[in-house]
Each structure stands twice: as structure tokens, then as C-alpha cells.
Amino acid sequence: MTKKYLCGVVSAAVLMGACPTAVFAADLENPLDFRSMTEDAADTDAGWAWDASSQTLTVENLSLTVPQGKLEERAAIYLPDESTVRVKGSNNSLNTLSYHCNGIYCEGELTFEGKGKLKIVTDSYSASAIYAKQGPVTFYDSVEIAADPDGHVIYIEKAKGKTPSSAYRMMLK
């Protein structure tokens, strides 16, 4: 009897271990602010790495969420002028569920590059998926930005836009 019971418990444990589980995004209580960062930094669990010398934010398996009531009238990610966001892989997401919380804010020129996909979701009519103070916002390679905003997809305060590559794709949902 005890052997049957033990076999049943072990079988149940093995089956439960084989079940798919949900992976939850890291909640942002404070913004990722790279504007005055002079040292390299990374959070592999959240899926980002900052190269200070080239002002490049690399995202690979990025999974960040700003919960409701946090970072209101701010942004999830702040970048300095002449920054680059290098997108790797197709499993990158940035969600802002807070009032007027932009996804990515840049002080000036912002470049997206890489062969990956980044999904940015904002949950406020007064928020932008991408907000550039000076612009331009440039897309290289075959980077794909899938934006699902309640507000703006891209907002450039002092627009000087250019699109030098025909290999970009902006998908609106």
C-alpha cells in the first residue's frame, strides 16, 4: 500500500513539474534612468543592459511593467540625447499601466536598431509609447516596434524627423 501511495505522490509531482507556468514581468517602482549614468549596468532578469560609452540600451527578453499608480507623469525608461536602443529577440515587452507614464523618453536624438521586436503598451491617453524631446527618432535594420498606446505612438516635441532606412516597420494595433 505504501509503495502505491509513494508512486502516486511522485507521479503527481512529476506531472505538476511538467505543467506550463506563467512568467511575470518585473514591476518598476522607479524608472530606469540612464541620462547621467557613466558606468555600464545590466539586469539580466529584467532583460536589459546599458553601455555607457556608446549610450546604447540593449534589450533581450525585456519584461517590464509599471503598475497602476506608480511613475505617474513620468516614464519607464529615460535616455540621454543620441541614445540607441538595440533590440534583440522577439520577446521584449514594456507595459505602463499608470497615468501619463511614457514608455521610453529620450532627451534628443533616438535610434532603434537590431533585428528584434519590442512591444510597448501604454494605458493612458496622455502617454506616449516613445517620447523624444528633440528628435529625430530613427529606425535601422529590421527592428520592429509594436506599439499599443492609448495615447501617442511616437511624440516628438520639436520634430525634425527622418527615416533613412526602408527596412523599418512600425506596427500599430
Question: What kind of feature is each model-predicted range?
Answer:
Residues 1-2:
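N-terminal secretory signal peptides that target proteins for export/translocation
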Residues 5-11, 24-173:
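A composition-driven surface/loop motif
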Residues 16-24:
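C-terminal segment of classical bacterial N-terminal signal peptides
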